Amino acid sequence: MEAPPQMPSISVVASSRAVISGRLTSATIVISRTTGKITAVFDSVILASEFPAGTPYTDYSPHVLLPGLVDAHVHLNEPGRTEWEGFYTGTQAAAFGGVTTVIDMPLNAIPPTTTVAGLKEKIQAAEGKCWVDVGFYGGIVPGNAGELKALVQQGVRGFKGFLIDSGVEEFPAVSSEDIKLAMKELADEPTTLMFHAEMLPPIAASVGDAVSTSDPPAAPAGPVEAYSTFLASRPSVFETCAVQEILSLAHLAPNLPLHIVHLSAMEVIPLLHKARTDGVKITAETCFHYLSLAAEEIRDGDTRHKCCPPIRSKLNQDGLWAELERHAEDGVIKTVVSDHSPCTPDLKLLPSHIPGHHAANGEVENSGSFFSAWGGISSVGLGLPIMWTELSHRKNLTSAPDDANTKRALQDIVRWCCANTAAQVGLQNQKGDLVPGFDADICVFDDTAEWVVKPSTMLFRNKCSPYQGRTLRGMVRETWVRGEKVFSRDDGFVAKIPTGRLLLEKRV
């Protein structure tokens, strides 16, 4: 009796363009079908005939092979607020956009990830629902310092705290004393302490959070549906004041990496440069929306654009891009993330003329109050084409093989959205590059295709995003997670069940 044929032990992907170790090159990538890891990389396109008969082989030329993106700032909201998002839909949206790893924020789920018990509930909720790999952050809140070391042992990738009201009562803001306690606990742990860096400067203390939450606002005066009114209520001094507070405490834990999430105000950049020159271990991220949306373009009532810190002026956006494009070792903004923070459409209070609005028959027409609407941008899985569209406009990118700007742009995106985000969460030896020993997380990117963002291409749960209707350049053709094709733009989700893993090993 003839023995059944053996399953090939490897699969192979190749392209005339791939970003390997930060460099655009031709490449052939050999993947172990047993481990899902890359076993070899060659800097040329090797023909299929050079491999054993039956080896799965695809040459994706002229599309670009990129490392799967690592989105290090996503709110998946499960358990507790699954009507806002969930592991299943949120990770499908990620895979659609070439994101192969997401790190889930500690708030907007109930319970928040501020205790080991809360983390275990989240893990239980996530099991069997993730289409890509998922890691978790812990939170710092008043009174939970005693939980932090245990959360490190349980594998959280870092910790986040707010210096201003978070918008949800179960995740209160921390005081300077709370931060000191957290720093004491985490000073010698392999982790990162991150902050939502907005706080009320002393001059605003008399009106408190009413500046940003009351309706009508306590200050400044103006129509609540006007974006200019909202923007004036969250000035850049909120960010600079918070960063100064954090830096004043940094000496308490000099070996603990600090990180500013979703930096919006360009005025923060000189403060961070000075701190890094003085030896403070601090970095920052910015978001796709701060790099692509501008205050001048936001219509009255279009609360799809509401987030905190707010989207600022075009001039400010240019300042963020200028910093981002500095030499890799000089810039303080190291990473770009989505900060996907969705909600149900009704919480956006959109007027009926704005796409994504929610108004049942007989309801009073919403005015689009920027002060009452939920703050958060929905964009997980859209980041790569958003970045490519912006860079195409700014750098006049072409598809010519020798276009130096295109080469630089591809390499920059991999640094900002793959390699550096992986390093931020301690996955630099596993994710964010296409080299032997790493997970075969691959994004097949068509850098010339253009497409329109529609509800059918927003795979997150609620189809309410400021990007709806926009034409984007750059399309993810396929997404591979640990050596298996998960998503194809032509065929959808190839596997019938989610196979993403939870990243629970302790950071080292």
What is each stretch, according to the model?
Residues S228-N255, R326, C343-F445:
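His/Asp/Glu-enriched, well-ordered alpha-helical/loop segment
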Residues N108-W131, Y137-N144, A150, L163-E169:
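Active-site loop-to-helix "anion-binding N-cap" substructures in soluble metabolic enzymes
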Residues V116-V132, I179-F195, L382:
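Alpha-helix-loop-beta-strand connector modules within alpha/beta enzyme cores
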Residues E50-F51, T55-K129:
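Metal-associated gating/positioning segment near the N- to mid-region
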Residues G146-G161, D165-V336, S352-G362, L397:
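Histidine/acidic residue-rich metal-binding segments in metalloenzymes
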Residues I354-S369, P436-L503:
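C-terminal cap of metal-dependent C-N hydrolases
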Residues L272, R276, K334, S338, ...:
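Structural signature of the urease/amidohydrolase superfamily beta/alpha-barrel
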Residues E2-P67:
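Histidine-rich, glycine-flanked metal-binding segment
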